[in-house]
A protein has these predicted regions:
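Nucleic acid-binding interface residues in structured DNA/RNA-binding domains
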Residues: 1-111
């Protein structure tokens, strides 16, 4: 499980972000946002951890680590609206996820 989560995190490019839930979904474990946190904690800082945020683009890390995350994201060109990342502009969507969403939209539009 952690290998798939770490692989999904590595795919997030500079200037893009994803929520813990997005990463869990992309790794094939919908609803496993907490496991994404555990995978990040056990990574030894080798992953682009700053690109993973709380729901709605909120930095959840307190104090200095939260400030560091914001600084790193801003240095990658990520824009903030108040305390949150502009998710409309910077949210990363894995190609497979987009395909699944298109299929879901087609199914729901027929009804």
């Amino acid at each position: 499980m952690f290998a798939q989560i770490r692989a999904a995190i590595r795919k997030i490019p500079r200037g893009k972000v994803a929520t813990y839930g997005d990463v869990a979904y992309a790794a094939g474990f919908p609803g496993a946002a907490r496991q994404v946190v555990w995978a990040l904690q056990g990574s030894g800082g080798l992953l682009p951890w700053q690109r993973v945020l709380g729901a709605g683009g909120k930095i959840l890390l307190p104090g200095v680590k939260g400030a560091e995350q914001r600084f790193l994201l801003q240095s990658e060109g990520v824009n903030f609206i108040g305390l949150r990342v502009d998710m409309k502009q910077h949210r990363y969507a894995w190609p497979l996820r987009r395909k699944k969403e298109r299929k879901l939209r087609k199914r729901t539009s027929r009804r």
